[in-house]
Amino acid sequence: ENSMLKSVMADAKKGDSFMRQNRIKKFLTAGLSGLLILSLTGCGQAAKLPETVENTSLVVEKDGKVTSYLVNTFDKDFYNLDGLTQMVEEEAEEFNATHTEATENPMNVKTVQVLGDGAMVQVVQEFADTDSYAEYNEQDLFYGTRVEALAQGLTVNREFVNAADGTPADSEKLDKALEKNHLIITNASAYIYCPYPVLYISEGVVMGEDGYVDASQSDGVVT
């Protein structure tokens, strides 16, 4: 009788954790905008991350590693910090377990913490590369050259504006930039911190004052 009760409780717990996991997925997803493309220069100062990240942000490193900062309202009716941390870590373990061929974990949880007065929570995850980020979050994120983008079947449209002032890009200069520099292509709604200064951006995207790209409201450009 006791073992029967145990298994019923275990099932109830499973159902509960499944529901909670669905909630956590919703909570953790950065959200989708249209596909946006950023063309980067090959040198210069990259955007500087603030000391406390209070907006959902993606940081792409020169070697393609990605740090994801997810910031959301902390609903104490649904989560407590320990439970949230446990769920985030379990999801990471499950994701990494499906990638046993990888030499390093595709994803690691860095921190789960409440910000400031406790109204917001921030989850920081590190991804080995843009593909791992894209797969885990079911979003698009590409960092590489135009040739690599085309090889992956991504179309690079040419509806760019100058990052500096929002004026339409000069097509000759744009071609040169696209030939030799890196691109970031994504549909994540987030502040995007690029490894190099941004030269050209899709229409509908805003440059932040510290050099980041504000794609949090954007419909981007669907390519």
Task: Enumerate the predicted regions with their spans.
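Bacterial signal peptide processing site
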Residues: 44-46
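N-terminal Sec/ER secretory leader and immediately downstream segment
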Residues: 50-111
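Mature, soluble, non-transmembrane domains
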Residues: 113-223
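Short, Lys/Arg-enriched N-terminal segments with co-localized hydrophobic residues
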Residues: 1-18
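C-terminal motif of bacterial Sec signal peptides marking the signal peptidase cleavage site
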Residues: 39-42
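Bacterial N-terminal signal peptides that target proteins for export
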Residues: 20-31
